[in-house]
Each structure stands twice: as structure tokens, then as C-alpha cells.
């Protein structure tokens, strides 16, 4: 599948992103880590070696790979991605984020058409916003997850983020004070910006239990994550679990993964 890059009209957001890219090129952000630099180097090598159009698609993780540790994209990465598009390579972001939480540096990048989000549980057309496929957690499994964790929720030891049709929802007490639920200070601004608060998250989950792309359990005490993970997977065979950070346990349908999400495109 070949996509020719078309320039998108600039908005104030695009202008701001462009300025950030220019600053990054002149004065590299000190948070740009070795992992991101290695990614840039490997991406440029792949494009350079793409003789005869052998490479048709590049699937990209986002956080701490395509994006730097502060969530921004370097000028070098942006240039490499645009070069890939111009060389007829389909660029496909694949992320644990929900669709509505994708950064503007990705959504406004010309030439990107499809994105696999919620750890591959959903695939969206980035241009139209239409969901073109995916998996939702079985309603019986949603209820089982709540039954196994709701007591801890009532005690303030865990809380939930749920992704419904590309949008992240969370309990209003958590959105107001993420740090009280184990979220590090560096992630507070992102959490408040992208999570839509509801008064009663458990009732919200039950109301939408047939629509959940993902349930993320946020852990006040990260040391219990592995034990909880094992207990959930043992009791509920219809789910898939993963974790990108120590305070978060991400749950999707058992068939959902970044690889399976890519298979829908």
C-alpha cells in the first residue's frame, strides 16, 4: 500500500510543532536518550538501503523510541519519516496510547494514514478518524477484572483507565491527583490532558463493558503488579496483559497485540 505525501494546512498547533522541531535541530533536547538516537540511525539506514522498493512498511512504536523521553519528536526523526513516505514506504505508528491521545507530532505528520493503538486492539484511519477494525474485551472478562480488583479500588490501592472508541476515561479523583495513585510527576500533565474524568469509573466501565479496547490498572504500589498480572491471566484466559511502566498493567482482548493490529491494515 503506497501513500503519496500531501502537505496538510498549517494550524497554530502545526506552527508550534514546527518551531519545536527547529529548536530541536539547533539545540538538541537533553532528554533525547540513546534509544531514540539508535532509532533515528536505524531508520535512516533502512531508507537508504531501500533499493528496488523492498521495504513497503515501517511500523513504529512511539514512546521512548520515535518520541523522546519528554514526548517530543526530534527534527532528525521527522525528516527521516518524511523521507520514508516520499520513498513510497507506508509509515504506521503502533502504540499503547488510545487514538485521541496520539501526539500532534504524529497526527500532523504528512503521509501517515493508519494507526494501530491501544496496543493493537484498534486500528484507525488517521485522516477520517474512522475505526476500521480491532478487538474489545469480552464483557464477562470485564466483569471478572472488576470483581478481582474492585476491593483494592475501594481502598485506594488501584484505579482504572479505560479506552472506549479511541478516548481514555478515568475516575475524576485520579485525574485530579494522579500522584496519589502512583503516577510520577513527569506524567501528570499528560494524564490530566488526555484522560476524561467521570464521577464513578466502575459504573462507567460496566455501562460500556462491550466497548472497551483496553483496561489499564494503575497501581499505587508497583511491587504488586507481577502478582496481580499472574492472578488475572490465570483466572481470565480471554485477556492479554502487558506493561510499559511499573505502575501500569494494560489489559486487552487475548487476540489483540501490536502485531495483530498491523494485520488489519
Label each PLM-derived region with a short phrase.
Residues 75-185:
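Active-site phosphate-binding/coordination module
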Amino acid at each position: 500500500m503506497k501513500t503519496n505525501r500531501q502537505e496538510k494546512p498549517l494550524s497554530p498547533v502545526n506552527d508550534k510543532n514546527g518551531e519545536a522541531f527547529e529548536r530541536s535541530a539547533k539545540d538538541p533536547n537533553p532528554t533525547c536518550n540513546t534509544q531514540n538516537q539508535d532509532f533515528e540511525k536505524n531508520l535512516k539506514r533502512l531508507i537508504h538501503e531501500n533499493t528496488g522498493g523492498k521495504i513497503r512498511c515501517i511500523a513504529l512504536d512511539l514512546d521512548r523510541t520515535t518520541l523522546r523521553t519528554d514526548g517530543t519528536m526530534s527534527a532528525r526523526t521527522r525528516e527521516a519519516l518524511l523521507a520514508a513516505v516520499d520513498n513510497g514506504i507506508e509509515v504506521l505508528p503502533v502504540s499503547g496510547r488510545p487514538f485521541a491521545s496520539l501526539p500532534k507530532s504524529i497526527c500532523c505528520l504528512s503521509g501517515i494514514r493508519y494507526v494501530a493503538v491501544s496496543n493493537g486492539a484498534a486500528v484507525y484511519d488517521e485522516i477520517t478518524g474512522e475505526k476500521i477494525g480491532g478487538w474489545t474485551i469480552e464483557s464477562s472478562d470485564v466483569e471478572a477484572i472488576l470483581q478481582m480488583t474492585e476491593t483494592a479500588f475501594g481502598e485506594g490501592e488501584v484505579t482504572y483507565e479505560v479506552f472506549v472508541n479511541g478516548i481514555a476515561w478515568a475516575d475524576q479523583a485520579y485525574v485530579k491527583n494522579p500522584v496519589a495513585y502512583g503516577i510520577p510527576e513527569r506524567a501528570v500533565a499528560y494524564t490530566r490532558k488526555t484522560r476524561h474524568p467521570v464521577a464513578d469509573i466502575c459504573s462507567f466501565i460496566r455501562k460500556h463493558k462491550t466497548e472497551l479496547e483496553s483496561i489499564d490498572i494503575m497501581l499505587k504500589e508497583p511491587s504488586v503488579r507481577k502478582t496481580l498480572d499472574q492472578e488475572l491471566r490465570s483466572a481470565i484466559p480471554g485477556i492479554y496483559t502487558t506493561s510499559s511502566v511499573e505502575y501500569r498493567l494494560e489489559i486487552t482482548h487475548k487476540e489483540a497485540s501490536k502485531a495483530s493490529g498491523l494485520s488489519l491494515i
